């Protein structure tokens, strides 16, 4: 356990940020799963809206430092491929 006052504060701050990051990561995964279930339902219009939501969530998580930009780009690419396969 830390003895220095600033170290104790850092521990509290890190716990808070960890909880926030877990919450945001969880909601991101839920958004992606929602898109995948809509794609399974083969509804093109709903899938487009769900893709837009998922892509926006990925971009937001990159800007907040929760997901690496390359991982977000790769995930968006895979989701877009599924959307395009649904359109074809």
Swiss-Prot record:
Signal peptide (UniProt feature, chain positions): none
InterPro entries registered for this protein in UniProt: Ribosomal_bS20, Ribosomal_bS20_sf
Domain of life of the organism encoding this protein: Bacteria
Keywords, alphabetical: Ribonucleoprotein, Ribosomal protein, RNA-binding, rRNA-binding
Molecular function terms from GO: small ribosomal subunit rRNA binding; structural constituent of ribosome
A Gene Ontology cellular-component term: cytosol
Ribosomal protein among keywords: yes
Stated family: Belongs to the bacterial ribosomal protein bS20 family.
Name of this chain's protein: Small ribosomal subunit protein bS20
């Amino acid at each position: 356990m830390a003895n220095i006052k600033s170290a104790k504060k850092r521990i509290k701050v890190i716990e808070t940020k960890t909880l926030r990051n877990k919450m945001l990561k969880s909601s991101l995964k839920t958004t992606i799963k929602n898109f995948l279930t809509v794609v399974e339902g083969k509804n093109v219009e709903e899938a487009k809206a769900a893709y837009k939501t998922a892509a926006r969530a990925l971009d937001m998580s990159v800007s907040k430092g929760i997901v690496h930009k390359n991982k977000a780009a790769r995930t968006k690419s895979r989701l877009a491929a599924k959307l395009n396969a649904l359109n074809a």
